[in-house]
Every structure is written in structure tokens, then in C-alpha cells.
Swiss-Prot record:
Family annotation (Pfam families): Rhodanese
Source species: Buchnera aphidicola subsp. Schizaphis graminum (strain Sg)
Protein name: Uncharacterized protein BUsg_049
Residues spanning the signal sequence: none
Domain Rhodanese: 50-140
Intrachain S-S bonds: none
Database matches in SUPFAM superfamilies: Rhodanese/Cell cycle control phosphatase
InterPro entries named among the record's database cross-references: Rhodanese-like_dom, Rhodanese-like_dom_sf
The organism's place on the tree of life at top rank: Bacteria
Amino acid sequence: MQDALFFISNNLVLSLIWLFFLILIFFLSTKNMFLKSKIINNFHAINLINQKKAIIVDTRSVELYDSGHIINAINIPFNNICRKTIKKLSLSRSVPIILIIDSLEYNKYIKKFTKYGLDKVYFLKNGMNSWNSENLPTTFKKNIFLK
């Protein structure tokens, strides 16, 4: 024990760098456990859609949505997410929701949904870029929800 304290006192900068990286590794490895949502890949999203009848909510702009979106995705831009919208969609706590977000600030989107009592909120990693890169099916149909 004295050797460890002796080493730390003689190599304070090295010890602080080591401690910083240890905390960083711990934070990054446990981050997903404390999120109220999960970051999922395309494979997991397809499983949720097919097996659990997940609802896909595309939070991108109307222009991006109209340029191509996942089949049966509902376009709800960030500013339109409210309790009234959630009720109109008839979303329940038991139905998984997959968010398509083209922003690095996905936490604010997820907080909006969890704020209204929806627990099973998922975030598609890399959004439509990932979906399109794997040549998964998309459509150009207009959004019927907001009409």
C-alpha cells in the first residue's frame, strides 16, 4: 500500500491521467444502462417492427421525410411532439417506439416521449443513413398523420 502511495505521489500527472481514463471507460460502458431508451441497430429495429409491432416515428423535417422514409413511419417533427400528438397516435406504454433522428441530440427527443409516459422508446443508430446504407426498403408516400 505504501508503494502505491509512493508511486502516486511521485507520478501525480501520470496517476491523474490514469484515473481520468478509468472514469471515462466506466462512464462510457455504463451510459446505456442509465438511458431511458436504447440505441438499436437496423436488425433490432426490424425485429421490433415485425414481432412487437413497433411504431416508427420519423422526427426529421417534412422535406427529408418526403425524400424517403421507412415504410409506415409517421413524421412528427420535434416541435410537434406533445401530449395531444401522443394521444392522437394512440400510443401505449406496451408498444415499442422507434425514433428516426438525424441529430446528435437524440436525448432531447427521447425525453419528450418519456415525459408523456412512454417507456419503450428506441433510437435507430445513425438514423436513415444507416437504413439506406443497407438498402432496406423505403417509401415516398406522404405523411397522412398530420393532415
